Amino acid sequence: MKFLLPSIVIFLVLCQVFGEELGPKEDLDYWTGSNQVQDEWLQADPFREIIRRMTRKPRPHQFIGLMGKRSPANAQITRKRHKINSFVGLMGKRSQEEPESYEWGTVQIYDKRR
């Protein structure tokens, strides 16, 4: 058993060493003299390219807002009236002037503590 393990290791090492090609690999030339992609990148001015990309506006079909696409059936844009003293949030509609609102109650509590 002690003789078998070193002989297998030596056999695998010899297979690795003699399994390699000894000649130069001329067909696998990864570093060619002319790199077409790099030449195209160097021709354009990088600063102008960055500014052009920053100032480019999205096309109308590319821009989709937070609420998703609008349906083409309702093409009319209707303006909703905004009430000055009301707030519609995730908890529902609340008015700032109502004394039973949460904000009004906290203001009253702070005034009483002073």
UniProtKB/Swiss-Prot annotation:
One of its GO terms (cellular component) is synapse. Tachykinins are active peptides which excite neurons, evoke behavioral responses, are potent vasodilators and secretagogues, and contract (directly or indirectly) many smooth muscles. The keyword Translocase does not apply. One of its GO terms (biological process) is tachykinin receptor signaling pathway. Belongs to the tachykinin family. Neuropeptide gamma contains alpha-helical structures at the C-terminus which may be required for interaction with a cognate receptor. This is Protachykinin. InterPro entries: Tachy_Neuro_lke_CS, Tachykinin_dom, Tachykinin_fam. Residues 1-19 form the signal peptide. It is found in: Secreted.
